[in-house]
Amino acid sequence: MNKKTIVVKFGTSTLTQGSPKLNSPHMMEIVRQIAQLHNDGFRIVIVTSGAIAAGRHYLNHPQLPPTIASKQLLAAVGQSQLIQAWEKLFAIYDIHIGQLLLTRADIEDRERFLNARDTLHALLDNHIIPVINENDAVATAEIKVGDNDNLSALVAILVQAEQLYLLTDQQGLFDSDPRKNPEAKLIPVVEQITDHIRSIAGGSGTNLGTGGMMTKIIAADVATRSGIETIIAPGNRPNVIADLAYEQNIGTKFIAHQSDRLESRKQWLFAAPSAGIITIDDGAKNAILEQNKSLLPAGIINVEGRFSRGEVVKICTQSGKDIVLGMPRYNSDALQLIKGRKSADIENVLGYEYGAVAMHRDDMIILS
């Protein structure tokens, strides 16, 4: 079975098909494709816009002032309508979904990042499709052009996706605005996002959503720099999601920088000063440096500093040499209690557990 992880972002224009409300027949077709891929073994994550449009329709298009508070009102009302629409359609295929409402702060904060990542992986590991939206009802600065485009790129990094699909009402990126120039040509492949590519991206799209082509270019830049292939494609093309998953050439493909895949992610994760030091024994040092293993509690000798789960800390040897920069799965107080113990003892000692490792290999940068 193909275990490729794909994040699919649906803009408001894709879900409404130009109407003032969610287009149920089109959403049904979207769900059919995702259900097919889900059953074929793909791991699919949905990032969905549409809450504000759904709220506006549910309230019968109220006359509201063009303020942040009005958008938050519509988002608060519409979010429940949006998730119900997804839930009912996936239920036809006996597929469960799990809702996450995120803001950029949830991903930039180290501990909340780890919690969000663990939740997403738990959902995927249990064959539940995550459905993610920006938490527009409480976010202020985030309700602006590009929130869910950028969010989808960060989610793709979060779940270590191979691909990100940005589905929109356009065929892809053109060399000029196709709505103004009938001679505009589709750009099928972008090897690198240059100033020229940015200059032809244009402005915002529809008035129902908050995203435009430029925000998709920014999202593609974030994703490809982290080794994630990104495709801008037409959301109304028949079978577009399944065809993309099976490598058909549709829309505009942004080539991922695969050589920088892991390092890019880690640069993004670890741009912070060290909050503490974990000293380990020689066995743990050899396991990390020579066998590419994670750090187990049994290998920890000492913990210095006060830090939260997910903050950046150093791992050093008994001689004091720094060998790793990384994010622990447990805070400093918990590590003090479980250091030197077997992983099987974690839950008995703490009353909870975030897994068998103190720091996962994926959350480490090797310094030496």
UniProtKB/Swiss-Prot annotation:
Function field: Catalyzes the transfer of a phosphate group to glutamate to form L-glutamate 5-phosphate.
Compartments in which it is found: Cytoplasm
A cellular-component GO term for this protein: cytosol
Keywords recorded for this protein, A-Z: Amino-acid biosynthesis, ATP-binding, Cytoplasm, Kinase, Nucleotide-binding, Proline biosynthesis, Transferase
Biological processes per GO annotation: L-proline biosynthetic process
Recorded metabolic or biological pathway in which this protein acts: Amino-acid biosynthesis; L-proline biosynthesis; L-glutamate 5-semialdehyde from L-glutamate: step 1/2
EC class (word): transferase
Family that this chain belongs to: Belongs to the glutamate 5-kinase family.
Residues making up the signal peptide according to the UniProt record: none
Name recorded for this polypeptide: Glutamate 5-kinase
Reactions catalysed, as given in the entry: L-glutamate + ATP = L-glutamyl 5-phosphate + ADP
Domain PUA: 275-353
EC number: 2.7.2.11
Keyword Transferase part of the UniProt annotation: yes
Molecular function GO terms recorded: ATP binding; glutamate 5-kinase activity; RNA binding
SMART domains, per database record: PUA
Main location: cytoplasm
Binding, substrate: 49, 136, 148
Record-linked Pfam families: AA_kinase, PUA
Residues the entry annotates as binding ATP: 9, 168-169, 210-216
InterPro entries referenced in this protein's UniProt entry, alphabetically: AceGlu_kinase-like_sf (IPR036393), Asp/Glu/Uridylate_kinase (IPR001048), G5K_ProB (IPR041739), Glu/AcGlu_kinase (IPR001057), Glu_5kinase (IPR011529), Glu_5kinase/COase_Synthase (IPR005715), Glutamate_5-kinase_CS (IPR019797), PUA (IPR002478)
